[in-house]
Every structure is written in C-alpha cells, then in structure tokens.
C-alpha cells in the first residue's frame, strides 16, 4: 500500500462548463510545497488545465460513500492520496471553479504573431521581387537605350565615313580633272611633237637620200678617176685636157667626200636625237598608260562610291520605315505591358487572398491539432483513471475479504463510477468522433484549397509562360527598335525630369558615358588614321605633281632640243648655202685660172709627179673609203630597217592616239556626268553636313550635360553602391533568416507529423488496451457479482441456519419455561 500511495499525480480533462473541485490528501512523504512544485511543472508542460485546492486534513474515521447527504448532488471519488469531487453544471455551489475560457492563450498569441511575421516576410519578399522585376525592366530599358545609342553612333560613323569618302572622291575628281586638262595639253603637245617628228623624219629621209646621192656621186667620181687613171696609165701621155680633167675630178672628189662626211655626221647626230626622242616618247607613253590606269581606277572607285551612297540612302529610308514600324510596335508593346501589369496585379491580389485563406486554414488546422492534443491528454487522464480503478478494484478485493458490507458498498460505488466513466467514455468517444469528422472535413477543405492553389500555380505557370512569350516578343521588338536621334534626345530629357528613376538613370548614363568615351577615343584614332591616310594621299599627289613637273620639264627640254635642232638645221642650211657660194666663187676663180693654163701647165707638169704620188695615196684612201662606203651602206640598210620599225611604231602610236582620243571623249562624258552627280552629291552632302552640324551642336550640349551629370553620377553611384551593398547584405541576412526559419518550420512540421503518427498509434494502442481492460473489469465485476451472490447466498444460508438454530433453541427453551411456569 505504501508503494501504491506514492503514485503520480492525477490528470483530468473536463469540459469548459463543468466546474471541478479537487481534494488532495496528505501522504507521509508529500508536502504542500512539493505539490505546488509539481503543479507548476505540470502547468509549464501544458498537461492539464485544472486548479487544485490543496487542503491539509487530519485523519478522520472512514465514512462510507453511500451515507453522504442526499442534498449534495456531487460526484466524489476517494483514493489513498487524492479525493475527486465533480459537480455537474446544474449545481449552484461552485468551489474553486475553473473554466477553459479562463486558461492562458499565450501560445495562440505567439502563433498569431508568428503568422503575422510570416505574412510580413512574405509581403516584404513580394516587394523585393517587385523591386527586382522593376530593376530588371530598368536594366532592359538601359540595354535598349544603349543598343539604340550604339546604332546611332554606328550610323554617325557610317555617315562620317561616307562624307570623308565623298570628300576624297571630290578631291580625286579635281585631281582627275586637272590630270585630264594636263592630258589634253599633253595631247596638244604630242600633236605638235608628232608634226615635228614627221618633219624631222622627212628631214632625215631627205638627208639619207642626199647622203645616198652624195655617196653615189662620190662613187661615180671615183669610178671616173679610176677610168682616167687607167687610161692615163695606158696612154702614159697626159695632155692639158687630161690634166684639167684630173684636177676637176680631184676637186669634185674632195668636195663629194667632204659633203658625204658632213651628211654622215648630221645623220649620226639626227639618229642619236631620234633615239633619245623615241625613248622620251616611250617614257611619256608609259606615264600616259599609268595615268589612264589611275583614271580607270578612279572611275571604278567613283562608281563604287555612288553605289555605296545609293545603298546608304536606301538603308536610311529602310531604317526610317523600320523606326516608324518599331515605334508602333513599341506602343503596342507598352499597351501589352500595361495590360500584363494589370493582370499581374490582379493575379497577385488573388494569390494574396488565397495565401490569407491558406493561413487561416493552417491556423484552424493547428487549433484542431491542439484540440486533438487535448483529447489525447484526456485519454491519458482516462487511462490514469483506469489505472486508479484497477488499484481501487484491488483495494476493493482486499476490503471484500475484510468486510462484506464495505465490499458491497464499494462494489456499488465502483459500479456507479464505472457507469459514470462509461458515460464519460461514450461522450468522449462521440466527441473524438466529432473531432475526427471535423478533422476530415477540414482536411477535405485543405485538400480543396491545395487543389485550388495547384490550379492557381498552374494558371500562374501558364501566365508566366505567356508573360515569357510576350517578353520574348517584346525583346524581339526591342531588338528591332532603332529610334532616331531626336527621339533619344527627347527620351533623355524626359528621363532627366523623372525624379523617381534618377539613380538608375545616373547609373545608365554612367554606363553609357564609358562606351561613348571609348567610341570618341576610337573616333579620334580613326581621325588620326584618316589624317595619316590624307597625308599619304597628299604625299602621293605631291609625288604625282613632281612627276608631272618632271614630265613637263622633260617636254620643255625636248622642245628646247627640237628648237636647237631647228636652229642647227637652219645654221647648216646657211652654211651649205655659204659653201655653195664659196664653191661657185672657187669655180669662177678656177675658170679664171684656167684661162691662164699655159702658165700653169708647167707648174702642173711639176705637180704631176706629186699628183701621181698623191694618186697612189688616194687609191689607198679610195680603198679605205670603199670599205667605209660598204659599212655606211650596211648602216644605211640598218637605218632603213629602223625607219620601217619607227614607221610601224608611229602607225601603232597613231592608232593608240585614236583610241586615247576616244577614251578621252568617253572620259569627258563621264566627267560631265560625274560633275553633275557631284553637284547633286554636294547638295545632299551640304544638307547632311548642316544636319550633322546641328547634331554635333546637340551632342556638344549633351556632352556638357553628360559631364555635369557624370559628376553627379559619381556621387549617386557611390551612394547607390553603398545602398545596394546594404540592401544586398540585408537581403542575404533576410534570406538566410527566412531559410533558417523555413528549415525550422519544416523540421517542426516533420516532428509534429511524427508526433501525430506516434500519438495516433498510441491512441490506437490505448484504445485496444482500454477495451481489453474494460473486458477485464467486466470479467472482474462479473466475478465480484458472482462472489457477492455466493456471499449473499452464504449469508442467507447463515441467516437461515442461524434462524433455524435460534428457532430450534427457542423451541427447546419454550417447553422448559412452560414447565416452570405452572
């Protein structure tokens, strides 16, 4: 019994409206302080919401439970250490009443606070997601603006290149015009030179014919001298006529030889000059061919530039059409984006509403779980009561052994308690069944909500896919968008006026200033390269100019040489005339001397011997001259061949000149067409230069604004970087905290699920044990009833036996009395 008296405290789960009064007996070892400590520990562990009234009682004689006052309609149960007194709700007397509504709601408040915190976190996360989406949109807009700026800069560069190419083409056209004028002048010079060459060739031919004639005359004179000398050798007697003939022939020979030598010298000089002129002409022709190639190349380049200009104009027109189309597409895209944002806001509102409903359902489910936990605690209390009932049954058995009356009373009390407990168990079972039905209904509602949530998620996925498709379409449209320069400037003005997006705009401008500076540096490098190329072209032009000057100097030298040749020819003609006059004078003087022949014959006779000696020497000289004449004939033949070659070359040169004249005419026509086209291009270029000048002025203004904004950008970027770092740190900390909380919640959910499963299993095991114990109690009650019946039968037997005995004794005593009485 002592071991039984040190049993654990009692747990009782009661309805909200039933007041509870508990009496606790003082054991040998328990104290009120210890009971209070146990009560506090139980209150902290959320076990039972029952207030105990601790009363220290003195030991009183045991009173049977059946003899209590009838007025008190309370249910009492007394054990070795506790006394349970339950008053129904109808009774007006309430001692230490406790209701469940008076219990603490700290847990519910904490759960509500946690739910509010989670809702706030979800709202903050949604706001962060919205800010991130806005940042992504702004980044996309910045990328679009950067792409448009790049495209505009590329178009500007292309326009600058085209203007530079046009300037170069104009410069080349001017150079070509100058070259063509020079070619015309050179053509005039070449015509004069050809006439002069023809005159020189005629002079050479006349000189050659004269040289041939002089050679033939010299040969005749030599042949006549040979015949006279042979005749004189045969006759060996010279007359005065023979002497005169010899002297005449001698003089004629000398004259012919002198003229032949002079003509040979002049021919050699003329041939040398002719060779030099031919070389100069070949050089000039080569230079003309080079110039013609340059002209052809320049014409081809002009045609290419014209084609490029036409292509550029077509591209500009196409770009203008595309820009208009892209503007329309941008408008449609903006309308679509607005509609998408409205749909998105509607969906977000629906999601928030569904999340709020889910949170409400989760709170209701948690409340149901709490009620289940309370029911489990009540079941545990009932189990404890069953344990105590078992103990009580054991005690009742012991009491039955001691006394039949106490056993009967306790049996009746146990029957009453069992009935009450059975009623309570039935009520609890019905309450548990109702709770399970409510749980199933809540689960069905929760499943419906989960299904609705999954449907909404699917709808969100479809909407997101549609949004992604629309974003892709918008991206394609944005890739195609190439806005004009004025539109960009207007956008820049509008974006500068926007105060809300000032920081993002500053970052965008900072990001756009860096590639602009890089492009400016590239443009400066390209300008330097173009300047170097222009310098190279200028050097080439100077070289061409120097070559042209050289050719002009050479032509002037050739003209001077030709003038010198003309002067020399005139001088030679004058000298020839003078020599002829001198020869005439000599012949006249000789004729005058021949009149004095008889005086001279004597002298001639003396001179004949000398003449014979001289003849021998002349014969030797004649042999040498014949050899020289053969060489001269060969040379003349070679010169004739060369003259034929020169004639053929002259004819080919004339044909080439004709072709060149035709080409020059074609070039003049092309120049006229190109001049008209250049005038048109100049007009177009002037208009474009005006527009470019205006754009440059705007760009300068914008560069100034950008420089002023860049300074502000640096400060704003630093602040933005700090804020971004702080926000990133906060976001990372929030994400970590959220992840940790999510993990904790998941672990708590898993724990609660495992606990629920364990509690369900324990509940099932407890129900099985309870049923088995109820069956045992029923069996024991039947046994106790059978023992009671047997005891009653035994008592009746004893009564009957005692009655019989006492009746027999009474019968036996009655006759003795009767006998003594008389």
Curated annotation (Swiss-Prot):
It comes from the Eukaryota. The keyword Coiled coil applies. One of its GO terms (biological process) is cell differentiation. The keyword Cytoplasm applies. Keywords: Cell projection, Cilium, Coiled coil, Cytoplasm, Cytoskeleton, Developmental protein, Differentiation, Flagellum, Microtubule, Spermatogenesis. It is found in: Cytoplasm, Cytoskeleton, Microtubule organizing center, Centrosome; Cell projection, Cilium; Cytoplasm, Cytoskeleton, Microtubule organizing center, Centrosome, Centriole; Cytoplasm, Cytoskeleton, Spindle pole. InterPro entries: Odf2-rel. Residues 26-45 are annotated as: Disordered. Its main location: cytoplasm. GO terms for cellular component: centriole; centrosome; cytoplasm; microtubule; sperm flagellum; spindle pole. Self-associates. Associates with microtubules and forms a fibrillar structure partially linked to the microtubule network. Belongs to the ODF2 family. Seems to be a major component of sperm tail outer dense fibers (ODF). ODFs are filamentous structures located on the outside of the axoneme in the midpiece and principal piece of the mammalian sperm tail and may help to maintain the passive elastic structures and elastic recoil of the sperm tail. This is Outer dense fiber protein 2. It comes from Gallus gallus. The gene is ODF2.
